[in-house]
């Protein structure tokens, strides 16, 4: 089988522990694209937070795609077209805001290059902004500032207390939206059914390709669905155990250019 599409998670997969793409990985992926391989970057990050990596890999030149917000949005990076978007119900936003406020946590959402929040100096808000190479923007009233469709909100704060809030919010909202922690201090609030595999199915249909032509590589729990979905599902050596158990193949770790090993073995 000739694999034509390479789907890559970012943190812990494409990037090393310093959140950088090594020169070896970069060269390998440019070469693969020269040979016609299409790259899809699939991450929980907002679109703007993935953009620097898309530029580094020259996805605009080679016609790659971005799956942001864990599959909440699909963008054709060459044309800039938003191919798919799944957004939060606007009527849920006041409840999310109140949950954060009542527990003295900051809540954020994203617009263009900004992380919008009432608490721009909060240490966890700053952590999220730095991770995504975005700027914080202070708003006086979070709910009034949202005059656009929201792909994701994030409540941030101290891990132990946030875990308690997660339980309460999950029980209250599980029929209507997704509530889970991506880091001990980050509580993700996303539309129901957001899933990398589901969005990849949408992308494949739009570009006329099959999942048998696709390799998906990841390390985290949110990569599980796409690893099971792809023609070849690959786990990094540093992946969570359940991810490694579900994969067709286990490559080297993100500190050992594991993505390079996949391309050299299956796409040369």
Residue ranges and their predicted role:
Residues 25, 50-54, 165, 169, ...:
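Hydrophobic packing residues within well-ordered alpha-helices of enzyme cores
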Residues 2-18:
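Asp-based phosphoryl-transfer active-site loop
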Residues 57, 62, 70, 172-175, ...:
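Short, structured coil segments at secondary-structure junctions
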Residues 1-5, 22, 188-268:
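Mg2+-dependent phosphoryl-transfer enzymes with acidic/Ser/Thr/Gly-rich catalytic loops
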Residues 23-123:
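Active-site phosphate-binding/coordination module
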Residues 36-40, 64, 152, 212-213, ...:
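Short active-site oxyanion
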Residues 32, 43, 70, 153, ...:
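Residue-level signal for inorganic ion chemistry
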Residues 99, 103-217:
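Conserved acidic, metal-coordinating active-site core of Asp-based
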